[in-house]
Amino acid sequence: MKNSSNIKTTKTNVHSNRFQVGRVLQVIVALVFLIFLGRTLYISISKTVAGENLSTRTAALYKRNQVLKATRGTIYDRNGFTIAEDSHVYTVYAILDHSSINYKNKPEYVVDKDKTAEKLATVLPLSKEQILKYLNPKTKAFQVQFGSGGSNLTIEQKKKIEQMKLPGIKFIEAPSRLYVNGVFASHIVGLAQPIYNKKTKSTDLVGTMGIEAYYDKYLAGKDGFKESSVDASEYQLPNGTNAYRAAKNGDDIYLTLDSQLQNYMENLLTRVQNKYQSKALTAVVEDLRTGKVLAASQRPTFDSQTKKGLTSSYTDLLTQSTFEPGSVFKILSFAAAINSGHYNPNELYKSGSLTVNGSTIHDWNVTGWGSIPLYEAFPRSSNVGLSILEQKMGATTWRSYLNKFGITKKTGITLPGEQAGMIAFKSKLDQAVTSFGQGVNVNVWQMMQAYSILANKGQMVKPQLVEKIVSPSGKVIQNYKVQKVGKKVVSESTVKTVLQGMQDVVNKQYGTGTTYKIAGKSIAVKTGTAQIAGPNAVSYTHL
């Protein structure tokens, strides 16, 4: 009886435990139900999940936004010849996954790798063996590209490959810039290169150098957009365009450059570079009356189309670099001495050497030409003669003219990164040597601007690279006119005297530029050489 009683007690306990567990489970289920009910009520009222509006999310599933790309403006020369224009490049890739089948149940993957490699090798700069390596990757891949050899393809290359009708061979299109002349004022025209835009998730052409960078906001234009309603299969619904803004194409820019002169200059510089293996060369042809630059180039340079010669350390030598001008600076010191009344052409001076503050200034002909009149100093390019004129002017007067000539002031040339230069002017020696272009650093545009006094009766004119900016509709937005810089620096009579001195450089037997004489032509010249800083950077080598 006792055992029977124990069994009954055990059964009662088990039943009680089951009942309690059941009650707990009921409570848990009820709580879960209440939580889900509360969550459902909250979502139905607030219409949000994790901070995201459900209506907006649902609407987005049936909408497609498309960026309408603007065409970048074209860059022309002064005569309307194209220098840079929009284009496209292509990257070829191969689909390898056998699941890629089109709606006609035909393969969209590479079927015959050997044949595909053989055909592609006739167009791409890759061998058949190299292409086969790409088509047989070590790890499984849905698709593969062909490295640099399969990118930046032209439309002609793309068409050749398409004509082969190779299954699985596809293309990715990307915006590009076509520079039709290759090496052509590359530092001035600059570059526009494709850069991925995270905001629009598309690739944009962005100016990174030269005119392309400086006028990027004009050239770039503004992308448009199109918002469309689609069905569950992502087909656009009839009348499904909800919002639309047309792309605004970029403005066209007409440069002052003359293509014929520019190409001729490029050829000349290449010949000089090849002959003398120069470390650096610069050249500018400018209409000093208007400031319009007709041609300009440098060495080293690069091919804008192929990028050959372009390095990360590339510098625009005309704008972003400064140099000691040497004897060509004598045009300015000569003009300042004349205009300030300190030039007596018939006054004699002893050439050859001059001591200033214990240091000796030498003429390029260190023995000199004896006692000669000051009017021979400029044609002979006499350092001593110009130093004497600087001493006659005095530091205050000479420095005031340097300021008027814009030395150490940026010209505002429409190119990125212009350097202002500097001048050493503390000691008597510093002041004297600036008269023949030492102790002063300038950029090329500063010198061209200062030289413009010779064509404008003493008035400086700013160098210009842009003729006009024209909208896509043909409206002239900006028309660049002659821009005077400050007040007249020197008088018209001073200019005439300087020009006579420059003609004497060519025409007089003692002139340094007699080799430039052309029969029947009146030519004004100033030759120039310079000393360069020695290895200790505190002295000059002698030239």
Descriptions of predicted regions:
Residues 1-305, 399-404:
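Periplasmic/cell-envelope proteins involved in peptidoglycan metabolism and beta-lactam response
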